[in-house]
């Protein structure tokens, strides 16, 4: 159940380089960290002066509960964000010890493969989509894991070191790291190694164009594919209906990314 509460900033640092636009925000917030599942998100107030007025949604990159602490962290949330507008500009000035207000955990997260599982797992992410996949990676068992990461340049490759148990494939559009091209093209070049009649669990998060392309590639596969959708959100809990997506099951319906998602079966998304 989502709650509104204050957390304390533990660190707020750039990653990649000192001039990077990517930041990692660590917050001491046990009441939310204890309940967060991979794929869920929080709505964070980025300023005290209501400029901007609306909260901003952020996937939880890591959550360390008080019952299951890891790496010396207990009750902490990690949020990966990119400085792109007024809200994230103000976030980049958060100082250690500062109070921040959050609502969470929100949305429906990923459905995990049953454990133990011999079914291979594939993660495919682009850009900031790697945040929710990083959270997922820490919860998977010891089965086969393949991770495909894409970005425009080497500076846009995020969370590449977060999957020590998996085989990581990287693509950049300018060829500055890994294979030159898109992550979809990279996945297509490797798909034969997976296409052996076995079922697979596939998890996707990234830009809409990437997800659309993967939908075409995977629609003929009898794989279990889940996608975490990115969307602009007004409220974060379904009241404003500002983040709807058309889906199909037995009939066409509009569902709210914030409330009914952000994770959906890929086969249910209707692309227009």
Which positions does each model-derived feature cover?
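Ferredoxin-reductase
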Residues: 2-96
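A general structural signal for well-ordered alpha-helical segments in protein cores
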Residues: 36-39, 57, 77, 133, ...
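FNR/FR-type flavoprotein reductase catalytic core
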Residues: 66-68, 73, 86-232
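Local cysteine-cluster metal-coordination motifs and their immediate loop/turn environment
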Residues: 132, 208-209, 230-262
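A charged, well-structured terminal subsegment
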Residues: 251, 264-272
């Amino acid at each position: 159940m989502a709650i509104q509460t204050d957390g304390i900033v533990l660190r707020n640092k750039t990653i990649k380089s000192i001039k990077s636009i990517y930041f990692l925000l660590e917050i001491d917030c046990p009441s939310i960290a204890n309940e967060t599942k991979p794929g869920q998100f929080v709505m964070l107030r980025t300023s005290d002066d209501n400029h901007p007025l609306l909260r901003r949604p952020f996937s939880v990159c890591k959550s360390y509960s008080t019952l299951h602490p890891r790496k010396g962290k207990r009750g902490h949330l990690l949020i990966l964000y990119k400085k792109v507008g007024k809200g994230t500009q103000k976030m980049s000035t958060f100082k250690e010890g500062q109070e921040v207000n959050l609502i969470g955990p929100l949305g429906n997260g990923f459905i995990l493969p049953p454990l133990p599982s011999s079914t291979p797992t594939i993660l495919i992410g682009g850009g900031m989509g790697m945040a929710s996949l990083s959270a997922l990676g820490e919860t998977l068992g010891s089965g086969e894991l393949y991770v495909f990461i894409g970005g425009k340049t080497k500076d846009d490759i995020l969370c590449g070191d977060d999957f020590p148990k998996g085989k990581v494939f990287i693509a950049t559009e300018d060829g500055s790291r890994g294979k030159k091209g898109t992550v979809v093209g990279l996945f297509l070049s490797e798909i034969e190694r997976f296409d052996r009649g076995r079922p697979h669990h596939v998890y996707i998060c990234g830009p809409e164009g990437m997800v659309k392309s993967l939908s075409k590639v995977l629609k003929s596969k009898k794989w279990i594919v889940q996608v975490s959708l990115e969307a602009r959100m007004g409220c974060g809990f379904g009241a404003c209906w500002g983040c709807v997506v058309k889906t199909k099951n037995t009939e066409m319906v509009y569902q709210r990314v914030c409330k009914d998602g952000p994770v959906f079966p890929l086969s249910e998304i209707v692309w227009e």
